[in-house]
Amino acid sequence: SEKVTEGYLIAGKDKQSISIEAGIVSVIGKIERLNLDILDDLQFSTDNSNFDLVIKKLSFDEIVLSDFRLPKTSIRSIDSNEYLILDIDNKILRGTLSLPKTGEFYPEVDLDFINVNLSQDNSKSTFLNVFNNLDVKLKLKTKSLLLDSVNYGSWSFDLIPEGNAIHLENLEGIYGKWGLTETSEGLSRLSISRSRLGWKSELLTKVYSGSPEKAFKQIGIEPNFEMDTFEATLKVNWPSLPWELDYPSILGDVSIDAKGLLILEQTELQTQNNLLRLVNIFNITDSFEKVTNLDFRKLYKSGFSADSVKGRVDLFKEKIVFNTPLLFKSGSSEFAWKGEIERRESGALGELNLEMIMTLPLREYLPAYALLLGGPITAGVVYIAGKAFERNLDQLSSGSWAVKGTLEDPKTEFKGWFENKKK
């Protein structure tokens, strides 16, 4: 039979104005309902055809895939050598779907916005449709992701199905003052898997901010600190779908790298927020000064400051642990924290079992009146918390402190001085 090389197809009963173009089959019209389930039974390809398929404008009152429904939608095609590009517009999403004309590429979705209503009763069944039916790799990006009409910024990722799991690889996003990108190993991934035990989400990525104070305010935390930059590498998991995340169920580890920290002086911390209470524990200008009588406020007039903060926090079901010390560096001084904090079932942090090792040049911290616990400076000897120092006070010395009690009522105990081996 003779092959079609040009012409037009009008969908629906409404009259349309259209003309024949050489080498083009044009499509125009209106369809009341399109069921995408039928696409599994169709074998459509433009390979080796001697015409271009052009959708001038197709309108659908409803597009259906199982329980998922798109409202009134307008579609037109855009010319491309590698892809059949469909421009799609409705009240839920607007953007392009690029379908490869050959096997050298995979489909791409590029959206101006997408509005996902997680509060709807069928939101989980909609996800299940994607989880159960997606069998090809997709590249997806959107300038604006709206969840229940709240804008969570721009995101991009490769959507890869694999057995009983689906992976969001090369995950990147910007949400206000927060950013999400690949780790130092070049990985950024959210994996969602299903087993007999239920759903599990695993996140490996790096979160960062160049304006941490504004970033924390953005998520409802009024910070008791100032900070220049913040990075955290997350290797965490939780036993639910991503949007059902519950803080007490998060397990894994978080590596922190912050610059320019200043913990502000506050007479009383009213908030019950775990993060802010934990940050307050690290403010050595208060509790540690009372134990040693060293004058921390001589250097930290506005609150405790650190040039950098690095370390790792391990999250277990019943505790959080500093196996790799959380190291605060401030000039020639270092403050290393290790130990663990009880993690209660509610998510609240309980009993403290921490050790802090302080390494510093003592002269910088001597009070102006030169009277310390144990006595004054005499004959080249200085007594600090009962230990005599005869050597040059400009050299580094180290002391150890134990921190017990709770975040609300911490108890600090001086354990003693020891020789520091650093040059």
Give the location of each predicted region:
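Short, structured interface segments
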Residues: 26-46, 108-126
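Flexible beta-edge/linker motif
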Residues: 20-23, 27-28, 58, 98-113, ...
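Extracytoplasmic loops and strand-loop junctions of Gram-negative outer membrane beta-barrel proteins
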Residues: 215-219, 292-295, 383-384
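Gram-negative outer-membrane beta-barrel proteins
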Residues: 35-39, 115-119, 146, 179, ...
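Short proline/glycine-enriched turn/loop segments at secondary-structure junctions
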Residues: 244, 388-394
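Solvent-exposed beta-strand/coil patches in large extracellular/periplasmic or lumenal scaffold regions
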Residues: 1-9, 41-96, 121-207, 224-353, ...
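Short aromatic-acidic-glycine turn motif
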Residues: 346, 361-369
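Short hydrophobic membrane-inserting alpha-helices and related fusion/pore-forming segments
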Residues: 371-383
